[in-house]
């Protein structure tokens, strides 16, 4: 299997999906260096769910799938800790990892194909309705939502993966799926 490139990882106790945002406090030297280097290179870094270990201290074992992120915003809190707002962009599969001397995990990755711009299928229309209600309830708290995308299978699936009260393992399962319709079918299967 071919490797598309190398990507430094920031393992977290959350599964980020494409288009979703997460806030992050960065205080460990290895991750401060990662953010600095990422800003200089413009290449971003990857976020993966932690399967074993913690997000501080010894290097954690990351899941085999993750998303590349871009830094949307940053600030330094009153406590002097760097605060980032990250947004997931494209999915990747980790082929192998190595740990640098400073404890930073770097992965050789294979990029997953972008989702097609398929329209929502009739059997998944309920999911778009559910998402519409969730977005309506969230109001301004979910400003990135664009109701015009409620007819696109990929967008509906990723937004539901982001907003529904799923376990991190369920989100990871969705992240591993290449077909947006399969993702929607799985979400439908999890509905009560």
Regions found by a protein language model. Name each.
Residues 1-192:
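N-terminal low-complexity, acidic/polar interaction/targeting segments
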């Amino acid at each position: 299997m071919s490797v598309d490139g190398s990507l430094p990882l920031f393992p977290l106790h959350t599964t980020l999906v494409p288009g979703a945002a997460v806030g992050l406090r960065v205080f460990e030297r290895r991750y401060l260096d990662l953010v600095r280097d990422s800003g200089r290179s413009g290449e971003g870094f990857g976020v993966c769910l932690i399967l074993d270990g913690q997000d501080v201290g010894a290097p954690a074992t990351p899941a085999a799938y993750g998303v590349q992120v871009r830094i949307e915003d940053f600030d330094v809190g009153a406590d002097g800790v760097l605060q980032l707002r990250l947004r997931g962009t494209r999915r990747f599969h980790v082929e192998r990892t190595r740990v640098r001397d400073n404890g930073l995990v770097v992965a050789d990755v294979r990029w997953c194909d972008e989702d097609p711009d398929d329209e929502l299928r009739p059997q998944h229309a309920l999911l778009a309705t559910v998402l519409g209600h969730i977005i309506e309830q969230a109001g301004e708290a979910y400003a990135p939502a664009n109701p015009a995308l409620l007819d696109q299978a990929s967008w509906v699936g990723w937004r539901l993966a982001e907003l529904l009260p799923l376990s991190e393992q369920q989100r990871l399962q969705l992240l591993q799926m290449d077909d947006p319709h399969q993702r929607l079918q799985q979400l439908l299967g999890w509905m009560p």
